[in-house]
Amino acid sequence: LFTREFYGNCYNALKADGIMVNQQGSPFYSEDAHAMQRSHKRIASTFQISRVYQAHIPTFAAGYWLFGFASKKYHPVDDLDSEAWSALNLRTRYYTTRLHRGAFYLPAFLEEMLQEVED
């Protein structure tokens, strides 16, 4: 399922301002970590913008999970409009724009794993 062809089809299905998000597993399990690297490499070779972000999900194995973000147009941090979000006056128990930005700042070991497949 998660082949270059699959991600190419996702790319083609999206409009110019479309965003694709996918699960990438936990980096603490070797098999998941390698799958994350393969997936990131394929997505990064398909989309102009590709980033990995993190979340703590206690019901998932290891409680620490990675996701992929890909877009033809939008950068998940640089294009975040905090003022527009604030203007919505939505009160959430979890999401904040600070948390949004922070999710994309990865620990050194993950940055190294991603750099291995980006080079």
Regions found by a protein language model. Name each.
Residues L1, S30-E31:
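Alpha-helix capping and helix-loop boundary segments enriched in small/acidic/polar residues
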Residues F2-A16, A44:
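A short glycine-rich, Lys/Arg-flanked "PGG" loop and its adjoining helix->strand segment in the class I
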Residues Y7-G8, A33-H56, G68-A70:
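Conserved Class I S-adenosyl-L-methionine
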Residues D17-Q24:
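Conserved beta-strand signature within the Rossmann-like core of class I S-adenosyl-L-methionine
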Residues G25-Y29, I57-T59:
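Short "lid" loop at the C-terminus of a central beta-strand within the Rossmann-like core
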Residues K41, W65-D119:
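SAM/dcSAM-binding transferase cores
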Residues A61-G63:
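Short acidic/glycine-enriched loop/turn segments that link adjacent beta-strands
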